[in-house]
Structures are given as C-alpha cells and as structure tokens.
Amino acid sequence: MGKVSKSTKKFQSKHLKHTLDQRRKEKIQKKRIQGRRGNKTDQEKADAAGTREQQQLKKSAKEEVFKDMSVETFFEKGIEIPKENKKLKKKTTKEQSDEDSSSSEEEEDMGQSMAKLAEKDPEFYKYLEENDKDLLDFAGTNPLDGIDSQDEGEDAERNSNIEEKSEQMELEKEKIELSLKLVRKWKKQLHDSPSLKLLRNIISAFKVAVNLNKEENIEDYKYAITDEKAFHELMFMVLKDVPQAIQKMAPYKIVKGARTLPNGGNVSRVSSIVKSHAGSLLILLNDITNTETAALVLHSVNELMPYLLSYRRILKELIKSIVGVWSTTRELETQIASFAFLINTTKEFKKSMLETTLKTTYSTFIKSCRKTNMRSMPLINFQKNSAAELFGIDEVLGYQVGFEYIRQLAIHLRNTMNATTKKSSKINSAEAYKIVYNWQFCHSLDFWSRVLSFACQPEKENGSESPLRQLIYPLVQVTLGVIRLIPTPQFFPLRFYLIKSLIRLSQNSGVFIPIYPLLSEILTSTAFTKAPKKSPNLAAFDFEHNIKCTQAYLNTKIYQEGLSEQFVDLLGDYFALYCKNIAFPELVTPVIISLRRYIKTSTNVKLNKRLSTVVEKLNQNSTFIQEKRSDVEFGPTNKSEVSRFLNDVAWNKTPLGSYVAVQREVKEEKARLMRESMEEQDKERETEEAKLLNSLESDDDNEDVEMSDA
C-alpha cells in the first residue's frame, strides 16, 4: 500500500466526518423525494406500463420461491427443471453433430488417402516422412494450443520495437552543430519570413552561446557551438535582427508616447518566446566587459521592452542587472549607456518601471559606495547626479520614496544618539557612532541633497512648488544632527563633507541654512587651541576622500594647516552664495566682528593671514552692495524686487565672487595634477604587472621545452 499523502491526512482529520454525514443526509433526502407521489424512476414507469395480465406475470415472477410451503415440503416434491424448447434443442444438436461429423469425415478421408498413397507409391510416402513429417500429421489440432507461442512472438516483437524507438530518440538527442551556413540561413529567413519555430530555434542556440562557460548546462541543449565565426554571427544576429523580426510578427502601437501591444494575434506567443529569451539577456548583462557590448545589449533589451512589461519578475531582474552595470563598471561610457537606458525606459513606461527603478538604483548605489577613494569618487559622483535626475521624472513618486529613505536615516541617527545618552539602549555606546559615521551614510545625505537641489530650483518650478521641497527641512535637520554628534577634530573631514552638501542645497534651492556656526566651532576646537606637533614625514591630509582623521595626523602641524585651508575655502563658498543679496552687509557684520576678535588672540600666523584676506573681501563686497542699493526705491517687503536685485551682474564680478572664483581655479588645478599623477602611477603598475605575467609565461614555456627534451 502506498504512503498516504499529507493532503489526504489533512482531509481525513478535518473534513471526512462532515463529508460522510452530508452524504447520508443527501441519501435520505433522495429517498424521501422518490417516495413522493409522482416521483417515479424510469424503471418504475416501465414496470407500470403494459396490460394487467403482463403486470400480474411480473408480480408472480418476483414472488418468493418458498411461498405457501415450507422448506421440507419443497424438497419432498423434488426439483422441477424447466423444459427446454425442443425445436431449439434439436437445431443446436444437429448443427454441432454436423460440424463434428464433417471434421471427422475429413480426417477419415485424409487417413484413407494417405494409406492408399503408401500402398501405391511407397517411395514418395517415405520421402514425405523424412522431409515433411508434419504434413502426414493430419490429426485435428486445438487452436488454443498456439496461444503461448504466439504471445511469446508478440512480446519479442514489442521489445524490438521499444529498442528501435529508444535508438531513434538517442539519434534525435544528438546535438546539432551550429555552423556559419546555418546561422546565415536563419538570418535570411528572419528577414524574409520570420516564424515562431524559427525564433525558438535561434533563441535556443543563443542560450547555448551565452552559457558556453557553464559546462554543467551545455549537455541539456539542442545545439553545440564550436565555430568562433558562427558564434559571433549568431550574437550579432540575435541582438540586432531578432528584435526587428519580433516587431514584424507582433507589431506595437505608440499610444501617448509609449509603445503598447495590441490584444490578440501572435502577441501572447511572441511574448512567451521573448520571456524565455530574457534569461539569456540577463546572463549577458551580468557578464558585460566593454562599452560596445553594453550598448548593443541595452539597445536590444530596449527594443524588446513592450513584450516584457507583463512579466513583473523578469522586468525586476532586468532592472536590477542594468542598475548593477551602472553601479559597478569603471568605464564612464558604460555608465552613461546604462543610465541612458534607465532614464529613457522609465520615462516611457513610468507606471511599470519607475518605482522599481528608483528603489533599486538607491539601494544599489548605497551598497557600491562602501569603499571610497580617489579612484572611485568620480564614478560615485556620476551615480549621484544621474540617480538624482531619475528622481525628478515623477516628483510625487520621488517624494514618497525620498520621504521613506530620509526617515530611515533619521531613525538611524536617533538610535545612535539614544545609545550614547541612555543606558537602556541595546546598542553598544562605544560602537554606536559607526552606524552614522561611515561613507554610506554620508553619501546618502549628499545624494539626497543633490536630488533636492536638482528638483527644487526656482527656475524649474516656475511658480509651482515641487513636492520634493518639503523634504529640505528634515534632510537639513538630519545633516546638522550628524555633524554635531561627535564634535571632535578627528571627524572634521566628515563635517566639511556634509557642509559642502548643505552649501549646494542652499545654492540651488534658495533656502537659507545657517552654516557659519558649524564652521566657527572649528576655530575654538583643540585642533587650534593646542600647540601642534611637528610631522615632517607626513604628506598633506586628503580631506576630499576621507571622513575621519587617523591618529598619526591628529594634533599635527600639517593637519592644522589643512583645517585652516578648508575653513577659509568653505567660508568663501558659503558667503559667495549671497554676494549679490541686498542684505549682504547685515549678514556678514557678525562674522567680520568674530573673525577680527579671533585674529587678535590667535598666534597662528598662516591662519591669521588667510582670515584677514577673507575679512577684507567681505568688507569690500559689503561696501559694493551698499553702493548698489543706495539708489533703490523699494523696501524689504517687496520680495519680487528684492529677488531681482543685481540680476544683470554675474556673481564672479563682485569683490567676494572674484576672490572665490580664483580660489576654486587653484583648487581644481591641484586636483587635476593629483589625478594625472594617480593615472601615471596606475599605468606604471599595469605595465609592471604585464611584464611580470610575460616573464612567468616565458618561464613556463621554457620548463615545457626542457620537459619535452628530457
């Protein structure tokens, strides 16, 4: 007896009793319905039909055998056997006797003729006995005697047929060698008369091509590829010609700027073929090594997008793979190609793709920016800018997604602050700051500042406020909380990095953010109040690609000089935002007073010289604004006129603006020289590695030659 399945056990324990009870009730109800007057079955109606005599005969036939007598009386009378029809009996016996007599007569006649043959021609009779004895065996045979031998023959024949079929299946399973001639034949058929069968064969061969490196899967496929030319021809044909053939077989329509498939026709069958083809495209996307291949594959996927929109899982995997190419490649051109695909398809198929693309892009970006250095920073900045543009496609959806992720950042900050202040927190207070003080968290804050800067520019809004503008306040609050979490000199690089993102946000959105207090705290820290240590062997600290100062640089002269340089640059960048503002003199007056006081008490000559230059430029710009506003006839309440003040003057034509522009050029020149030196170092390292590989290969070749000589 087979094992009882789990579903059967479940039915027996829960539903069996109820089912049996229900069947009993139904049976009783059926009997009641049949017992009612007029509710007769077909058999009962047939029994009721006929004459009265026929009904009495039927009734008497159904009566019991022992009616009106006992068992003993019945056996005493004896058993009466019903009489057979004599005519029928005579007929059947006569037929049987005729058959038996005819067969026996034939046997007797045959025996007599053989006896006469033996008398007349004994030599021929002897010849028959020696060569064909079965011919003389003329006795009657039973036809059932040959059944066993016949069955054995049929079994042998059946087994041979099965063997032939299995051999045929093995022959069919033999792989088809993909030749260049076959590929070109397929290509011609694609252009002339594409069909579903042809598409299936091509896609099956393409699946073999993309899985050549996976030996465990090769045995399952119909085709085998050994010709390199056929391989390349197949790849180009599938990526270029197959999408065009699919569009011929199931053409789409453009409705409201988006490609839409009609109902009916070959759409469902073609879409199922494209669905199976998507798996090969995913493998190809994950193995992209150069820009040319990336552009070709992405173009092919773009052509097939209308046929994949109904398959949500495959669509999600495609987005994930393309975003993976966008985030992991080190080639800028490949990044641009993948970003172009994402922004074009999300604009066209906004409802189907945009939300998934935004969430996948952000999560993938955060994972990829864990390690940040001089080499990876340009690519990370490109990812930030391109992803920020994606969030501007639909600002309502961008607000929903952005609110969710900024809220997560605020929760992380709150948990960190609770861990450092409350003893009941489950997080280790000594390690809690690492949740916030890392590159991923800082890049995330900087990314959202770029998103809001891109979407909340007054020129773009044109009088209608962007929904994303509501996220500026919570983002600024989280950023300020992160800056002031640990106000020690060790994390001043992180402070500078986040201040730059706040300056960018204030510049593009027009929102005033009080940044000077964050900068002034640096001047009163131990980095400037304590006497620095000498460090002749240390290089200049890289504030652009670090958020934490190492112990080797703390309290050193070179670190202090780097802090003073960063302070002056950020101070100039911040006040350059308001260098044309009509209220600039009132804005900088407290700053000028505090800086002059600091210069009087400070003994750092280099810092004092830099601060004096900044104070001088602030005073010059303040005088410039006072001269320009002396002729205006509007008051502070007239906001439209205030916003148009000095619109015809470029920011770098002001005293402070020209100073900041020169400082930025010097800074950019230093960064360019550092990048060039880094690229030269990379090239030297690559050449050394190539030489080392060549030397190792030559050594291996020499060893092979020595072994062959031996």
UniProtKB/Swiss-Prot annotation:
Disulfide bonds: none annotated. One of its GO terms (molecular function) is mRNA binding. It holds the Pfam family Noc2. Coiled coil: none annotated. The keyword Nucleus applies. GO terms for biological process: ribosomal large subunit biogenesis. Residues 1-17, 25-38 have a biased composition (Basic residues). It is found in: Nucleus, Nucleolus. Present with 29000 molecules/cell in log phase SD medium. Interacts with MAK21/NOC1 and NOC3. Forms a nucleolar complex with MAK21 that binds to 90S and 66S pre-ribosomes, as well as a nuclear complex with NOC3 that binds to 66S pre-ribosomes. PANTHER family: NUCLEOLAR COMPLEX 2 AND RAD4-RELATED, NUCLEOLAR COMPLEX PROTEIN 2 HOMOLOG. Belongs to the NOC2 family. This is Nucleolar complex protein 2. It comes from Saccharomyces cerevisiae (strain ATCC 204508 / S288c) (Baker's yeast). The gene is NOC2.
